[in-house]
């Protein structure tokens, strides 16, 4: 993506889940949206959006989900449903290029929007930063956010699997994914002979 993009919207979602796959993939629901608006020229954060979302298909969070995300049943029980959060996210990200680390977040937004009978809040334009980072690094395979942070010499901040913290960490990788900073060569575990 060129530097002519005015703003990037980094989105990270957390969704209902369980360790035994009792919740079918097409029934997972967003429980937290973390989004960071980033200036396209400077790549500096401009503003944040963060909201818990109350699930309706599987309203009770599994113990695994709570352990993984640190999101409690109380957090989501008091939250608005996706139908009410989606327009706020759309307004927040208006005219920005929607970005996420991988395709999952885009697919989950589309799935929740379909379930509610509403339009996808962020439209069709999407930049998969996981793919962009792999291309910039010259890698054939993609890596997770934390592995990418370590590769460029950054320490992860915040709590992993929390929407806004993960969005902030992804934003720190934006200059590398866009090719504005070089991605260091991957280190190997092999020792020189």
For each predicted feature, which ranges?
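N-terminal accessory regions of nucleic-acid-interacting proteins
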Residues: 1-13, 18-20
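Metal-dependent phosphoesterase core characteristic of DEDDh/y 3'-5' exonuclease domains
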Residues: 2, 6-7, 26-33, 37-69, ...
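Glycine-rich, highly charged phosphate/nucleotide-binding loops
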Residues: 75-84
